[in-house]
Amino acid sequence: NRPDPQIIWDKTNNPIWNTWDGYYHRSTKGGGYWEFKKKLPEYWTIKYRDLTFKVSPTNFKHTGIFPEQATNWDYITEKIKSCQEKEIRILNLFAYTGCATMVASHAGADEVVHVDASKGMVDWAKENMKLSHLENNKIRFIVDDVIKFLEKEKRRGRTYHGIIMDPPSYGRGPNKEVWRLE
């Protein structure tokens, strides 16, 4: 019983799978809930290099961080640190809780624009900014549908030196716009 539709490999009988601390139960109607062997705090923090991120299990299975993105965060850091531009502007679309936003800002981007359709995720990203002591860095937080935001930026003539995108396969914008990656 594995709730992720992306799991394509056969289940193994490795005894380590019986030592879980938290188990996510997916609902057939969407969402779900976590089951924990022992009581956990509502949230906790983890460190990634010099940054601190909030972790909190959600009813849609996520925890606020995708650790498998660390390789991409290292790449972002390397590219920003080696960039010869004077004013480095980075655009992070579908920015979620802002781990890549914080990485780009900490690496030296002069401005990072963080765009996500979910106000709750943008608020979480602001918490990650504070936890990582980046309040004095120029980070713009935008709650908007990504396509609508990009259309506005095009009309404004705004350009960026780098664009970070990790779109979901399906999602809804702040005004119920549907996003489907096909």
Which residue ranges define each predicted feature?
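Glycine-rich S-adenosyl-L-methionine
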Residues: V178-E182
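Conserved SAM-binding loop of SAM-dependent methyltransferases across substrates and taxa
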Residues: T97-D110
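Conserved alpha-helix/loop element of class I SAM-dependent methyltransferases that forms part
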Residues: P67-K86
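Non-catalytic substrate-recognition/targeting regions of SAM-dependent transferases
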Residues: N1-I65, D74
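Conserved SAM-binding motif I beta-strand of class I
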Residues: E111-D116
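Conserved class I S-adenosyl-L-methionine
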Residues: E85-Y96
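Switch II (G3) loop of P-loop NTPases
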Residues: P167-P168
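S-adenosyl-L-methionine
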Residues: A117-I164
